[in-house]
């Protein structure tokens, strides 16, 4: 009987121990997922992510900058605005939005600018606007531009009054209402226009706003992915132009690939943004020149006979030649192998230089 009691007690203790052990669960063991074995030489297919493809829906390449822009803008005719370039008129307004800027010498050692805008919207002030010279008419014409100016030299009057170029004159005729004077400045350095006035003038005169389907691209352009590095060119990090009054120069910034413009000893800025003017391409176009009057007469630039020059981009420069078939055609620029030059997308500054002064420009 005693033996049976001990057996029962022992069984009770064991049962208690087992129940106590069941009160605390053991953690589930971690199971590693091993890949299925493969035969030697068998490839394992893995899912790769394709790089995102940039789309340009609703956009087109600008015929004047080579950049992607709104497709409705890419088919518009540009406007060309004559802009004064003397110290008293600084800062100029709107130059930072231009697609192409021409700088030409005029009388007395000064230069005058012509800014070409395909997208001329959003500018509350443009200029100041000054008078036309005959050769500027032909530079504007090759862009099929609507030309805004404030008067003209006597030699330009006949062509401006003809049907050769659509133009709006802020001094004579009915065009004055599309310009305004800033009374805080003295005339003639105080005439300006705006985007709205430009658009109103074009509408009032009934000028077409669309480029012809046959116009094409004004220049040949590389792409952003494959820029033209001018690997055979010489270094061109500072370009100094021999214009007596403004004494302008450009300095290259290798970080953004732009040439920053200086004149009158300081950065040249756009009064709309207070940002320094910077461009991607510089073309120096050397031309024959004459004086139409004796003494300090009216300068005339030969825009058609062809000549030499320089093409500058991405910190390099090469020699070029240029030609133009007619008064209405585009100027073409060629490298020393006879190939048309390829610009990089962005703004272009064209320097018109008299042949007699071409060797006084410096490129370093």
Across the structure, where does each feature detected by a protein language model lie?
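Sequence-pattern detector for short linear motifs
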Residues: 5-6, 27-29
